[in-house]
């Protein structure tokens, strides 16, 4: 517990001692802020292998460029994480073509992000906000598509009865081939038509009493 000795001033007695820590207003210019450690770690992690510009960004870049590089680094790390987790999933043969195309697209987007980050770090300029937003939105859409395919592939992997999923291509090809899907029919074979069974005709009997003749059906 801290103890304070009272102190006298021209205005009276300071009961808790004379204040020693004065308030200083934070600088309004974001360029004077220190680079957050989280940003630096994210940028270092999101750069291409063998490239480290975290120290360069920390010392020379403005806060605007640093923010853009940080956002790009987050997106690049997200792509890398998706690709690593997706490679560990067993993809059915019928879906492999679509999955490989999507993975190649994500890798291309990540390469564009890497080149943009290096350009911002070296030149010290800021990227147009509309262009940055378009790049981030493009990556976000591709990541959502990849996540949906990842969930489907994961479900197929966990379902032991999903062997039918691996035979989708074979089923589709068999449907398009009539010889493989339709049964063999011999045109020379004439099936025997069964003879219908008819009820016996009604018996007409003559009544025994006299009078007008009446016919009764039994």
Curated annotation (Swiss-Prot):
Phosphorylated. A lipid is attached at residue 11 (S-palmitoyl cysteine). Keywords: Host cytoplasm, Host Golgi apparatus, Lipoprotein, Palmitate, Phosphoprotein, Virion. It is found in: Host cytoplasm; Virion; Host Golgi apparatus. InterPro entries: Herpes_U44. Residues 199-218 are annotated as: Disordered. GO terms for cellular component: host cell Golgi apparatus; virion component. Its main location: host cell. Belongs to the herpesviridae UL51 family. Homodimer. Interacts with BBRF2; the BBRF2-BSRF1 complexes oligomerize which might play a role in tethering the viral nucleocapsids to the host Golgi membrane during secondary envelopment. Interacts with BGLF3.5. Interacts with BALF1. Interacts with glycoprotein gB. Interacts with glycoprotein heterodimer gH/gL. Plays several roles during the time course of infection, including egress of virus particles from the perinuclear space and secondary envelopment of cytoplasmic capsids that bud into specific trans-Golgi network (TGN)-derived membranes. This is Tegument protein UL51 homolog. It comes from Epstein-Barr virus (strain B95-8) (HHV-4). The lineage of its organism: Viruses, Duplodnaviria, Heunggongvirae, Peploviricota, Herviviricetes.
């Amino acid at each position: 517990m801290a103890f304070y000795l009272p102190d006298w001033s021209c205005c009276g007695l300071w009961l808790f001692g004379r204040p020693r820590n004065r308030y200083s207003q934070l600088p309004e210019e974001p360029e004077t802020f220190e680079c957050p450690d989280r940003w630096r770690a994210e940028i270092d992690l999101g750069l291409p292998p063998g490239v480290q510009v975290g120290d360069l960004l920390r010392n020379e870049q403005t806060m605007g460029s640093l923010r853009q590089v940080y956002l790009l680094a987050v997106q690049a790390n997200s792509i890398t994480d998706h690709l690593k987790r997706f490679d560990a999933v067993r993809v059915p043969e019928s879906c492999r073509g679509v999955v490989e195309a999507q993975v190649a697209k994500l890798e291309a987007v990540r390469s564009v992000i890497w080149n943009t980050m290096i350009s911002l770090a070296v030149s010290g300029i800021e990227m147009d906000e509309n262009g940055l937003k378009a790049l981030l939105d493009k990556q976000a859409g591709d990541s959502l598509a990849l996540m949906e395919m990842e969930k489907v592939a994961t479900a197929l992997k966990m379902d032991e009865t999903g062997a039918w999923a691996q035979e989708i291509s074979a089923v589709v090809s068999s449907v398009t081939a009539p010889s493989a899907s339709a049964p063999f029919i011999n045109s020379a074979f004439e099936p025997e038509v069964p003879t219908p069974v008819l009820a016996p005709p009604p018996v007409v009997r003559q009544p025994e009493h006299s009078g007008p003749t009446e016919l009764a059906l039994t």
